[in-house]
Each structure stands twice: as C-alpha cells, then as structure tokens.
Amino acid sequence: MKVVIELFGASRDFSNKNLIELDIKNNSTIKDLRGKILDYLDLNFKGNKNFIKIVNSSAFCSNNNIISDNYKITNNEKIAI
C-alpha cells in the first residue's frame, strides 16, 4: 500500500516536495515505516548520519495525534514526521 509522509522541521531536507511517498506492506507499523524511510535515505542520501538520527528520534503523527511505533498504518493514510 502507498503512504504519504508529510515532512516537518529538519525532515524537510529529505525531499524538495515537503513529502515522500513510499510503498509499504499491509498491516505495517510506524516502526516498519521508520525502516522504509531509512532505506529511502540510504538510497537517496547515502545513509546521511544526521538524517538517520532525525528519523530515529522523531515523533510521527496522524490526524494531529502523536502515534507510537506499534501504530498500524491504513491504506492511503497521511503520516507526518
């Protein structure tokens, strides 16, 4: 399934569009999404260590609510970091 990740703060450097779109497996969690974002950073920014720190320390939210690493993502859901 496809998920749109809206980028805020320091994570805006991950894309010039202020968002990234990733394909993830059904029933993926925020923890899984962190891994996909790290894969994206490795591919596009050669594993930039500062970007990795941002992903590992950032909170995620959906519908203006902070969500935990075990939160299950739904299809076409917008997630923010």
Predicted regions and their residues:
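Ubiquitin-like/PB1-type beta-grasp interaction modules and other compact soluble beta-rich domains
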Residues: M1-I81
